[in-house]
Amino acid sequence: MDSPCLVALLVFSFVIGSCFSDNPIDSCWRGDSNWAQNRMKLADCAVGFGSSTMGGKGGDLYTVTNSDDDPVNPAPGTLRYGATRDRPLWIIFSGNMNIKLKMPMYIAGYKTFDGRGAQVYIGNGGPCVFIKRVSNVIIHGLYLYGCSTSVLGNVLINESFGVEPVHPQDGDALTLRTATNIWIDHNSFSNSSDGLVDVTLTSTGVTISNNLFFNHHKVMLLGHDDAYSDDKSMKVTVAFNQFGPNCGQRMPRARYGLVHVANNNYDPWTIYAIGGSSNPTILSEGNSFTAPNESYKKQVTIRIGCKTSSSCSNWVWQSTQDVFYNGAYFVSSGKYEGGNIYTKKEAFNVENGNATPQLTKNAGVLTCSLSKRC
């Protein structure tokens, strides 16, 4: 637990998480000092496109007591064993753990990973986590760092599918493929081989909130590739996250689909903050952008694949209530005419960007103790 990556994770998470905030997700549950007796209340607190995510609510509590990993025949008490069961489970941890997976871990539907009350690290030079062809998964309170590429090997996908060969993977920290109703909240992501969060292959109904992203170049990819137009159905909410320090680009980088980027705090980037190709709809609202010092890096946005300056002028990229520092600026285009993007259940109040540092100051893994509010 004394590697430079782990020390950095602890330092940044302490600095970001030292005070209480009142964004609508946190105010739903964080004031309750008895949260540990009512863990599943968390499932009622999501907002945005992933607000219907149930995770393991209504299922049994499953406690991880063993940090070991067997990709094919996981032992009871290990994380992979709980993740691959074919029933709803709310997965908690008996204490602090550093879990180095031997192969990518696939999560079955209707699961919650709830790291509150422990410091749970996944990565450490091993492959990380996949959510593929399932629905209703909540990932909360984990450190995902140092995720690496994997080799060809057999993996237990879940109880129904059994063991299947899994091809080498790129080393993303968290990958969503053809996944629906997913909520990723209050995690700390850094230092992985490829991306930190990838949402692809018609994944939709996703909320990514209250996370800390730092020390990484390619942060978040939404949309598989420019040839995969089925991602037009993708809807993702990116809200109350802290991007930085030391993030390069893709916060997010979108293809097709609809992305609402709301009340996120951006430290200076090295390439760009928000980008995309293949005509995604990007609605930026109430964010705080601080540009790097270099004069040629002030633009928040980058449009990729435009053959001429006018060929992307009809893309709907809108900025409302954003605030800009150190010369940052957002290039808007198009006009959104789709009406309300959210149902009544999904909708949440978005503050002016001036309030965003307060709303995001607890982004990342929280420090939660029994009988005390997080």
From Swiss-Prot:
Name of the protein in its database record: Pectate lyase 1
Cofactor(s) needed by this chain: Ca(2+)
GO molecular function: metal ion binding; pectate lyase activity
Keyword annotations of the record: Allergen, Calcium, Disulfide bond, Glycoprotein, Lyase, Metal-binding, Signal
One record GO biological process: pectin catabolic process
E.C. number: 4.2.2.2
Thermal activity profile: Optimum temperature is 60-70 degrees Celsius.
pH dependence: Optimum pH is 10.
Chemical reaction(s) catalysed: Eliminative cleavage of (1->4)-alpha-D-galacturonan to give oligosaccharides with 4-deoxy-alpha-D-galact-4-enuronosyl groups at their non-reducing ends
Active-site residues, Swiss-Prot/TrEMBL: 250
Signal sequence annotation: 1-21
Keyword Calcium among record annotations: yes
Residues carrying a glycan: 158, 191, 293, 354
Lineage: Eukaryota, Viridiplantae, Streptophyta, Embryophyta, Tracheophyta
Main function: Has pectate lyase activity.
Gene3D superfamilies reported for this sequence: Single-stranded right-handed beta-helix, Pectin lyase-like
Cystine residue pairs: 28-45, 128-147, 306-312
Family stated for the protein in its record: Belongs to the polysaccharide lyase 1 family. Amb a subfamily.
Binding-site residues, Ca(2+): 170, 194, 198
Post-translational modification: N-glycosylated; contains fucose and xylose.
First-level EC class: lyase
Co-factor: note: Binds 1 Ca(2+) ion.
Protein's pathway: Glycan metabolism; pectin degradation; 2-dehydro-3-deoxy-D-gluconate from pectin: step 2/5
